[in-house]
Amino acid sequence: MPKRNDIKSILILGAGPIIIGQACEFDYSGAQACKALKELGYKIILVNSNPATIMTDPDMADSTYIEPIHWSIIKKIIQQEHPDAILPTMGGQTALNCVLDLDNHGILKKHKIEIIGATINSIKKAENRKLFEKSMNKIGLKTAKCEIVHNINMAHNVIDKIGFPAIVRPSFTMGGSGGGIAHNYEEFKNICTEGLKLSPSKELLIDESLIGWKEYEMEVVRDKNNNCIIVCSIENIDPMGIHTGDSITVAPAQTLTDKEYQNMRNASISILKEIGVETGGANVQFAINPDNGDMIVIEMNPRVSRSSALASKATGFPIAKIAAQLAVGLTLDELKNDIIGINSTASFEPSIDYVITKIPRFNFEKFLGCNDRLTTQMKSIGEVMAIGRTFQESLQKAMQSLEIGVSGFNSKIKKYTSKSIKKIKNELKEAGSERLWYIADAFRMSIPMSEIFSLTLIDKWFLFQIKEIIDIEQEIQKIDINKIRYNHFKYFKKKGFSDLRIAQLSNNSEKKIRSIRYNLKLHPVYKRIDTCSAEFANDTAYMYSTWEDECESSPNNNNKKIIILGGGPNRIGQGIEFDYCCVHAAQALREDGFETIMINCNPETVSTDYDISNRLYFEPIILETILEIVRIEKPYGVIIQYGGQTPLKLAKELEQANVPIIGTSPDSIDKSENRKRFQKIVSMLNLKQPKNATVTNLQEAIIQAKSIKYPIMIRPSYVLGGQSMEIVYDEKNLTNFFNNVCINFKKFPILLDHYLENAIEVDVDAICDGTHVFIGGIMEHIEQAGIHSGDSACSLPAYTLNKNIQNEIRSQVKKLALSLSVKGLMNVQFAIQNENIYIIEVNPRAARTIPFVSKATGVALAKIAARVMIGKTLLEQNCIHEIIPSHYSVKEVVLPFNKFFGVIPELGPEMKSTGEVMGIGKNFKDAFSKAMLAAQANMKKSGRVLISVKNSDKKNIVSLAKKLKNIGFKLDATTGTALSLINSGINARLVNKIQEGKPDIQDRLKNNEYVYIINTTDSNKTIKDSKIIYNSALQDKIHYDTTINGARATIMAITSNPKKYITSLQKMHHQIKSTN
């Protein structure tokens, strides 16, 4: 059947910002859908609020709207663009919920817009727990014993029937948000209260516990002719009770019998038919009782998902692309298999002859005091995927990819005692992010296999695999590595041992182990991901390393090869923005005739799509793998500046190994990263820095701190996302920092800065070609200096800085770029205090603001800088004059505190946000208002506001309180703040702090009296009232600000109209070009 011709234009909904439970896998799926449908000749209208996505690049769609994914905004876009159809299955839960809202408001019916890829009925049947259970019963499939409730009273009535432990799952949420496992009445009440608030339909499913059952997933694709294929089976190593996004998973499933697999396969196909997924992909989750083989259906997602991205990368089968093509009427047998080409169609199920392991990446260290135990609510930030010929090989490669300081099964226990045995057993029973390594320690401590199984409920097949690795480790510790033979060494490598891990076990250096291996002429070979287990020849160079005999890499002798090192797993501080830059580098250099080679290990990203670069190596970004790929590919150059700190940390070792690094040299990178060397350059240029000193130990720090004066900002070298940065207010804080944190940074000096209070922070992105400097954009932060730049909203152009200050900033950026011999991208951060300009730091690499600036100005900075690295000047690329747009763009951040209940959501020098959104308006307040709507800030136009600020903010709060009064808000304030307001003629109701009398803050919060909270505290104090305020605000979705600057911007936004300026990126960029 040909594609549908009755549809001319399609509106695609994106997923919005990166949050826990919904990450960059939806940029991957959305980008694939845009490309596929555009190639078929459809007009594509795209809506997404996330500027850091490839899908929002202006060439991906005909009309691109970086706007909030909110039904009221989509309504305006529909009125402007008049689409024929809407595709909601590429944008995760956000897009599905939005299309339901559009349907409920009658907008789709009014404008005669057809939903493709899914139907309202199929979405409701899959997402509504009662309808889903009814559908499964109809086709003879079991589901867990469960009840639907809509309030706390109903919940209490059903729990006695279900019994404890019980699993609570809210409807229409993502990543298990608001859910959890309740072991008693108190936990049950708390989880249900939270779940009801987060569920858009105010509906909870109370499930019987299936903890300990084995969990599986099937990725299924169906077309309109009822052709169905299973793309991939996925097995969770962790049993039921842990969210699948937080589980270690393996593909294909390893412990299913053929009969179980066939039953699951048939059930999956029946489920898609019954739910009504007629065209596209879906994910179906099952649980199997390991005692008797009983199978039940957990749930299904009638859309592409996190697992779809993993399955696509695991098999090479582009699920999102195929699903988009099926949505417009094509069938599986009409679509070719892109990897194999003409020999096969998409109707053949992929066959794989290797093993995939996915391990999630957590960031609990960023949220002190959070509950780090793993449950049904997802908490991981990112993930890695590794490929090997065996499970053991892929598992060890996955661990090497995580960048958490492990090279394999590194021990978590320093000294084995009876106390440590207790610790190990507790970690096995109550799963945390490090349980895998504690299992290894359990084997080292000779804890019986049967006991490890009873504590973890992980299938014994996986436990035996881990035990064998630990046995081999003990063998490595005993041998004389200098006398090792080729076959013996190869045996270790086949089991997944890296050179570094062998070095650690044999008490040698990695360099020595590599030298021994090279002398033995032992090197990996590379196999291809081809969807068919090598049954057909193919030209797609999507590869992984292993230790067999035949190599399928077949590198050519082209001397125009560029290797791009990716950013590895998503984590706070290093996210999708860096992948965006890597993709742009590959695109630009391919356009210029270079063969691009990508090395990365993140299955969620666009950079690991098989058609982004000429050759893709899905490998850990570690020294060993890079040197091996460089050895066989012999590239012209290697780009290390686009993948964040992951590749930058390897710069010196790569240079020592004669790897041809292009762009800014490792020495120049060190000049900016090494605090002592950078200080000399700033001094030479007669520029200002806050009073500072570089120290290497506590004694030096105490002496220098007396000279610098408190408060002091502590900045380690070679970190990203403000890792371990802290503001300290006295010697006690300083001592604690050095005793608890600095042990991780022994190799590098530590910078102590005088902390500039109430300063404005400014970010500048620029490109230098060695002769000229192009200013990409000057961004003014909304939060004051001291809040990490990645956690502060910012505006382009600057919204309060005068022209003289901005011109001086431009001058200083140019001086720094030329002095540091930057060749490519650089980012400079300044603090402005009383018209004085202070340099905070310079990063001669891609910054997380590059996508935002590129979208705001229409200048593809990452592409231009990549061309600079290969020798093209800025003049040759016509990059001469800075682009200053007439509109305002505001980047706002999205914070994950709702996943870490009990943690004070306080902003500081260490980054905590997971993602970002962008708002565009004719003025600052409209742009900021739109950004807040996109970030799902719950702003009200009237109601009661609670204000409680620290002493240093009491002067500044007065004018803001006046504005709130004028808008029509009623004010409450704590004692000191109320006194300041009343003395300034502003009426405010006094509210008691805890223990000051009833009713107090806690009572008023419980009574839902507030619509907005302004609460600032001294960073060096933990205030009981503040913790209660923050937690209540999170639980009840009350908008809150923790800084005066943030409150000032919020109040401006409250008075704006975000819907009056909605335009496409293409029109906006055309306007910029015509006026610059």
UniProtKB/Swiss-Prot annotation:
Residues annotated for Mg(2+) 2 binding in this entry: 299, 301
Oligomerization domain: annotated segments: 404-553
Residues the entry annotates as binding ATP 2: 715, 754, 756, 761, 786-789, 829, 841
Protein name: Carbamoyl phosphate synthase large chain
HAMAP family linked: CPSase_L_chain_B
Pathway assigned to this chain's UniProt record: Amino-acid biosynthesis; L-arginine biosynthesis; carbamoyl phosphate from bicarbonate: step 1/1; Pyrimidine metabolism; UMP biosynthesis via de novo pathway; (S)-dihydroorotate from bicarbonate: step 1/3
Entry GO terms, CC: cytoplasm
Cofactor note: Binds 4 Mg(2+) or Mn(2+) ions per subunit.
Region (Carboxyphosphate synthetic domain): 1-403
Annotated keywords: Amino-acid biosynthesis, Arginine biosynthesis, ATP-binding, Ligase, Magnesium, Manganese, Metal-binding, Nucleotide-binding, Pyrimidine biosynthesis, Repeat
Gene expressing this chain: carB
Entry domain remark: The large subunit is composed of 2 ATP-grasp domains that are involved in binding the 2 ATP molecules needed for carbamoyl phosphate synthesis. The N-terminal ATP-grasp domain (referred to as the carboxyphosphate synthetic component) catalyzes the ATP-dependent phosphorylation of hydrogencarbonate to carboxyphosphate and the subsequent nucleophilic attack by ammonia to form a carbamate intermediate.
